[in-house]
């Protein structure tokens, strides 16, 4: 579920893997492995992505389908 969500969010925001990888301070090849599910994405990077896309961690991990981030 995480892999689909991070890829969909990236594409919905018209971003390349390289752009997101730069935000996460990792190589594009590593980020690509996260999207394909070949590597498990660390929690600290999920937190950065949730803040970047303004979605909840629950959305990223598939616990909810509600994208909105509630403060």
Language model feature labels by segment:
Residues 11, 22, 51:
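Alpha-helical residues within the helix-turn-helix
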Residues 25, 44-59:
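DNA major-groove recognition helix of helix-turn-helix/homeodomain DNA-binding modules
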Residues 1-12:
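A short, Lys/Arg-rich alpha-helix, primarily the initiator
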Residues 15-33:
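Short alpha-helical DNA-recognition segment
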Residues 38-48, 67-69:
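Short, basic-rich loop-to-helix N-cap that marks the start of a DNA-contacting helix
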